[in-house]
A protein has these predicted regions:
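Acidic, proline/glycine-enriched N-terminal capping motif
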Residues: 1-89, 94
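Acidic, low-complexity central loop/insert segments
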Residues: 97-191
């Protein structure tokens, strides 16, 4: 079964030109001419429905121990509010998937993996790990804001409150009483 994001109707309203299926969800693939979208990405600001980048929450007293177990990266400097690019590996070091790891609280992490059933893999490991962790999909739907003017948009939306959010950092906040997590991870090199 393929799910629709909470933004699905809005993408139709604003002229989505196509969808692909990613993580068992519809992911918009474009709204106009691809070269115009590229120009917006490198010169202006873009805003996208990335709800298909489904988050996985790992929480509990052994959350850090569990996250260390599923990937080889040193997390000694993964403080609350840190984001890390990680590679999820099997017991022989083979790559399962990659993900962005966000540490939201002392014992709460979010993983944002690529396409695949990573949550089932993590739940399977947790069952027999002896670690005190809970693994589930939080009810969140990511949006992505990119481009060299994205910082100005965030500044305007949050009235300058998060101007100091560093690269590969995240924080829990709210906008007009809507709780959210904002993360600055970008891949387009605009900021």
């Amino acid at each position: 079964r393929v799910r629709k994001s909470p933004y699905y109707e809005s993408t139709l309203k604003y002229g989505v030109t196509g969808f692909t299926v990613y993580n068992k969800m519809y992911l918009p693939t474009g709204f106009s001419d691809p070269s115009k979208e590229y120009e917006s990405l490198i010169n202006d600001v873009t805003f996208g429905d990335f709800a298909a980048e489904r988050q996985i929450e790992v929480s509990g007293p052994d959350a850090l121990k569990f996250v260390r177990y599923i990937q080889p990266r040193n997390l000694d400097k993964c403080d609350i509010g840190s984001c890390k690019y990680i590679i999820l590996t099997d017991m022989d070091g083979g790559i399962i998937n990659d993900a962005c790891l966000l540490r939201l609280e002392e014992d709460k992490f979010w993983l944002s993996p690529g396409d695949g059933d990573v949550i089932l893999w993590l739940q399977g490991i947790a069952i027999n790990s002896g670690m005190d962790v809970a693994i589930h999909e939080p009810d969140v739907s990511p949006l992505q804001i990119s481009g060299p003017k994205s910082g100005k948009l965030i500044q305007k939306l949050f009235k300058g409150e998060h101007d100091d959010l560093g690269y590969y950092k995240a924080m829990q906040t709210s906008l007009e009483d809507i709780p959210m997590v904002i993360a600055r991870t970008g891949w387009s090199g605009e900021l």
